[in-house]
Amino acid sequence: MRRDKMAWIGILSLVGLLAPVSNVAKADDFSTDNNLISKSSEIEPADPQSAFLVSKVKILERFENKTNLTDVELKTLLSLVGFKGRDLVVAWAVAKKESSGRPLAYNGNQKTGDSSYGVFQINMMGELGPDRREKFDLDSNVELFNPVTNSKITFHMTKGGKDWSAWSSVNGPRYQEWYNKYPCKS
């Protein structure tokens, strides 16, 4: 009995080793008898960069129109749209200071000159609104409640996280508190 099992294991191992070689050899003999395939299929080697981009897009899709974000989700989203290193920490702290990381945050206080939307409280007051809608191809200010859209626009407005001059909250005491609370510091 034991001897039969060993023989079967040997046969299956041999088949397992030869099957891939056999399939590669048959790939050139691809037939079109069923009329479903018009010519030989060639499999291109996967580009690691494109595989990463596909997975990045898939992960970003999970954040589309999300109505709340955990601290770690916010960090992940900001990293996916392009913030890196210290700029990522700054972006996270600004988002927490501006909206507590809430995608649906809105400040419509006209006395302070605000009509600000989303995670980064992008201000659309007065002439800023039409200008920014055109520049960022927005049909409506409401699109800024989408955390992916809001974060991508902020990444662009801050020149990749290098220029936060449009945000008065940077370097204030509340910002510094959030900066010090950044999750996942390495």
Predicted feature locations:
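N-terminal Sec-pathway targeting helices
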Residues: 1-11
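Catalytic and binding regions of secreted/periplasmic enzymes and modules that target cell-wall glycans
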Residues: 90, 109-111, 117-186
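Second-shell loop/turn segments in exported
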Residues: 59-65, 76-82, 106-109, 136-147
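Boundary at the C-terminal end of the N-terminal hydrophobic targeting segment
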Residues: 25-27
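Export/targeting segments at the very N-terminus of extracytoplasmic proteins
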Residues: 14, 18, 29-101
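Short amphipathic alpha-helical segments at helix boundaries and their inter-helical linkers
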Residues: 95-115
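Secondary-structure boundary/capping signal
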Residues: 85, 103, 162-166
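N-terminal membrane-targeting segments
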Residues: 21-23
